[in-house]
């Protein structure tokens, strides 16, 4: 339906109170007010809380993600074949080591190009940026330098605050509210390198269907959105994993189980860490191909990423390739390469 006037923040708030949707064009306008700093902090806090209580729709999420992409500092990767993001919404409260960060080195060693988009810890003891720094990777590179990392090492890390400067208007409000808001689910939808393929972990089963449909509307090519039934925002080793898959424009939803891939089930308790240093130690153990639950869950997730990146024709084949990349030492070599390149480019 056409709208003759631009919706005001007050009208948008009233919609959320009445549990009515904010339409696409309206949400674009509201989100631009937020990102440009034109909305007052009080109004912003009320509106993002109202959206959360109402439950954000796929349309609202898609429009908000489009605006976040508009305002972002992009990384231009010339060849997007096999380019994939491995990302989680975070906030799953499982306090595990950085599984997606470790998986990216394995996926890169097996032929994917990984443009990893992440930040500091949300609710975990160690966010992807925290462990990257502990590993000696410089996370504050210019976009051209990150593109070079992706082209040369097959992997690059985009530190979210550097690519979403407009988020500074929202950051203090998110921090003070202390609850999940639409921004927790927007981060993974706004990859600055526009990776066409994605493996995304989410913190709630309802988000599987929502995020895969948002990705479809945002033009993703091959995407897997996963939720481990033990609460993990990863492909889980401790329970079945709900998967939403977008491929060739079609969405399918199904469940996978560790035993489908001849994996021994293990509780995620074995994967818990307290600090970025502990996460780093566990990650290095995996890259040294040390047997155990940590290695198995990385193989599962790297396998899923290789399937999403179209390097493997199935998750099963992805797992075989991921295991080989660890056994050969190629995954560990990718980490050394990224450390070296980021230090050189930062100099």
Curated annotation (Swiss-Prot):
Binding-site list for anthranilate 1: 88
EC number(s) reported in the record: 2.4.2.18
Reaction catalysis annotation: N-(5-phospho-beta-D-ribosyl)anthranilate + diphosphate = 5-phospho-alpha-D-ribose 1-diphosphate + anthranilate
UniProt keyword annotation of Lyase present: no
Pathway info: Amino-acid biosynthesis; L-tryptophan biosynthesis; L-tryptophan from chorismate: step 2/5
Cofactor: Mg(2+)
Residues annotated as signal peptide: none
Family that this chain belongs to: Belongs to the anthranilate phosphoribosyltransferase family.
Subunit and partners: Homodimer.
This protein's name: Anthranilate phosphoribosyltransferase
């Amino acid at each position: 339906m056409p709208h003759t006037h631009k919706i005001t923040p007050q009208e948008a708030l009233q919609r959320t109170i009445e549990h009515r949707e904010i339409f696409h064009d309206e949400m674009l306008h509201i989100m631009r007010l937020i990102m440009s700093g034109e909305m007052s902090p009080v109004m912003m806090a009320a509106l993002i809380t109202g959206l959360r209580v109402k439950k954000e729709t796929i349309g609202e999420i898609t429009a908000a993600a489009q605006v976040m992409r508009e305002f972002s500092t992009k990384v231009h990767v010339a060849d997007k074949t096999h380019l994939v993001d491995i990302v989680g919404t975070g906030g799953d409260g499982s306090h595990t080591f950085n599984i997606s960060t470790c998986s990216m080195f394995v996926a890169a060693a097996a032929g994917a190009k990984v443009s990893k988009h992440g930040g500091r810890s949300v609710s975990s003891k160690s966010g992807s940026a925290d462990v990257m720094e502990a590993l000696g990777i410089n996370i504050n590179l210019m976009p051209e330098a990150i593109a070079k990392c992706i082209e040369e090492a097959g992997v690059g890390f985009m530190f979210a605050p550097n690519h979403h400067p407009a988020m500074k208007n929202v950051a203090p409000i998110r921090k003070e509210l202390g609850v999940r808001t639409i921004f927790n689910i927007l981060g993974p939808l706004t990859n600055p390198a526009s990776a066409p393929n994605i493996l995304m972990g989410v913190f709630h089963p309802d988000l599987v269907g929502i995020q895969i449909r948002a990705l479809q509307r945002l033009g993703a090519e091959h995407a897997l959105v996963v939720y481990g039934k033990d609460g993990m925002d990863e492909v889980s080793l401790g329970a079945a994993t709900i998967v939403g898959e977008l491929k060739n424009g079609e969405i399918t939803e199904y469940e996978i189980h560790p035993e489908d891939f001849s994996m021994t089930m293990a509780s995620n308790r074995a994967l818990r860490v307290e600090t970025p240093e502990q996460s780093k130690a566990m990650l290095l153990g995996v890259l040294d191909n040390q047997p155990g639950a940590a290695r198995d869950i990385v193989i599962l997730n790297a396998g899923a990423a290789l399937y999403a990146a179209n390097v493997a024709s199935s998750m099963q084949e992805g797992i075989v390739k991921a295991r080989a990349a660890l056994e050969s030492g190629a995954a560990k070599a990718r980490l050394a390469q990224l450390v070296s390149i980021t230090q050189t480019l930062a100099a």
